[in-house]
UniProtKB/Swiss-Prot annotation:
Species per Swiss-Prot/TrEMBL record: Homo sapiens (Human)
Stretches assigned to the Cytoplasmic side: 180-220
Residue span of region Disordered: 198-220
Protein name in the entry: T-cell-specific surface glycoprotein CD28
Chain positions found as Phosphoserine: S189
Chain ranges of the Ig-like V-type domain: 28-137
The entry's keywords: Cell membrane, Disease variant, Disulfide bond, Glycoprotein, Immunoglobulin domain, Membrane, Phosphoprotein, Receptor, Signal, Transmembrane, Transmembrane helix
Length: 220
């Protein structure tokens, strides 16, 4: 932007000298909503003459933005060979260029050029002072009642949902493992705490009682 401001001092308005046309422009314009109107005022009578008015972009005027060609008695031809959306209108000692759909990176200095094509002699203007067109970005304010969620918000929602599902699966798996482990410990504990049982009383087999014999009595 500083370079463009310095350019205004490098290209002062040129006064009419013999076969030159004086062209004046506004020093600076701001393009709101990506559109701007630039008027090129000249001090030359173009009535009944065929002329060509063009708008150029850059300090070296390398880009021809828009062209208005014709005369007062015929319909003007307006065109752009560089992709700009432009229109033109011929007024009283002025040509107005209407530029639309401008981009922020098209902020630059623009120069008007007026040429008398017919009848001879050919006339044009010295380089004018130029106009800096500052294209401001279009900011859309969200509705306060129904604000539209931004893309990062949905990304966070999706990531949060995935993490929640993962946490739920891990929790369920842990609970299942814990229940099974607890059941296994209980079964093992019951087995270890079982007291050994003594075998039941066995039935004793008694010999039938027989009184002892006194063999001495038999001897006597």
């Amino acid at each position: 932007m500083l370079r463009l401001l310095l350019a205004l001092n490098l290209f002062p308005s040129i006064q009419v000298t013999g076969n030159k046309i004086l062209v004046k422009q506004s020093p600076m314009l701001v393009a709101y909503d990506n559109a701007v109107n630039l008027s090129c005022k000249y001090s030359y009578n173009l009535f009944s003459r065929e002329f060509r008015a063009s708008l150029h972009k850059g300090l070296d005027s390398a880009v021809e933005v828009c062209v208005v060609y014709g005369n007062y008695s015929q319909q003007l031809q307006v065109y752009s060979k560089t992709g700009f959306n432009c229109d033109g209108k011929l007024g009283n000692e002025s040509v107005t260029f209407y530029l639309q759909n401008l981009y922020v990176n098209q902020t630059d200095i623009y120069f008007c050029k007026i040429e008398v094509m017919y009848p001879p002699p050919y006339l044009d203007n010295e380089k004018s002072n130029g106009t800096i067109i500052h294209v401001k970005g279009k900011h859309l304010c969200p509705s306060p009642l129904f604000p539209g969620p931004s893309k990062p918000f949905w990304v966070l929602v999706v990531v949060g949902g995935v993490l929640a599902c993962y946490s739920l699966l891990v929790t369920v798996a842990f609970i299942i493992f814990w229940v099974r482990s607890k059941r296994s410990r209980l079964l093992h504990s019951d087995y270890m705490n079982m007291t050994p049982r003594r075998p039941g009383p066995t039935r004793k087999h008694y010999q039938p009682y027989a009184p002892p014999r006194d063999f001495a009595a038999y001897r006597s």
